[in-house]
Amino acid sequence: MGPWGEPELLVWRPEAVASEPPVPVGLEVKLGALVLLLVLTLLCSLVPICVLRRPGANHEGSASRQKALSLVSCFAGGVFLATCLLDLLPDYLAAIDEALAALHVTLQFPLQEFILAMGFFLVLVMEQITLAYKEQSGPSPLEETRALLGTVNGGPQHWHDGPGVPQASGAPATPSALRACVLVFSLALHSVFEGLAVGLQRDRARAMELCLALLLHKGILAVSLSLRLLQSHLRAQVVAGCGILFSCMTPLGIGLGAALAESAGPLHQLAQSVLEGMAAGTFLYITFLEILPQELASSEQRILKVILLLAGFALLTGLLFIQI
């Protein structure tokens, strides 16, 4: 009998629970997700390269191929827009609020928005420094000296045709290549944090839900990223390398999260949130000043492009809704 007369079987003893050997819940799920995400994302990254850059295909000279790539890129633009507004930003804001609450920090200053702005200005400053350096080094084409809020270079030739406007010869312009690199970096960094979320999970069911959602999400993002890099006129080898890098980031995050699951604290979470906020700010810049202006700059097939943009947005919205 217990001290208050209850039967001994109904008395809960914490020491009895603590004496049980710890079981790594969901570890096999995390390892399986690591392999599946690596393989699936890599395959999805290479599919656009194999289809659009086949040996012997005159990609640059084919107007129909350029139009098809432009339409598919509009769909990818919708995916990136949904990723920015419905995935990166909410994840970042929730993570940093949780970290600050765990540290018992109350702010009067909008720190979350300030970190976003710093990521935004980071890309802006990098681009302007690059443009200033090229302008001082020698004469540059008209496209490279235009304001970044105007027509965006690096797109297909027929997008900016007009009297008296010199056209690019197929080589990527510096701002477009730089933006492509920043896009890869921001997505890669966010992928590491998404992998960390899976690796830090201790519940088997929740880990499986996150893994399935990431499999669909990363597959679509991998295809969209490769299309965007091809649209920037980067070499196929460079696009493939970026795809491999992007494919490795989420598995890397899963591995790190599984290793750090027992030692993660509020300070670690705050540092992670700051980095994720910087990445979200850079992605915000790329989405609204690179991807959307470039896809909607052409006067051809405007309605179809808007429909595809909305379709891409709706697809990722549906995936995120299922994930919730």
UniProtKB/Swiss-Prot annotation:
Residues assigned to the Cytoplasmic compartment are: 52-68, 126-179, 228-237, 294-303
Explain what induces or represses this protein's expression: Down-regulated in prostate cancer.
Question: Which GO biological process annotations does it have?
Answer: embryonic cranial skeleton morphogenesis; in utero embryonic development; limb development; monoatomic cation transport; zinc ion transmembrane transport
Q: Where in the cell is it found?
A: Cell membrane; Endoplasmic reticulum membrane
Q: Name one GO cellular component term.
A: membrane
The UniProt keywords, alphabetically, are: Cell membrane, Endoplasmic reticulum, Ion transport, Membrane, Transmembrane, Transmembrane helix, Transport, Zinc, Zinc transport
Q: In which tissues is it expressed?
A: Ubiquitous. Expressed in most adult and fetal tissues including the epidermis.
- Name the InterPro entries for this protein: ZIP
Name the UniProt record assigns to this protein? Zinc transporter ZIP1
Originating species: Homo sapiens (Human)
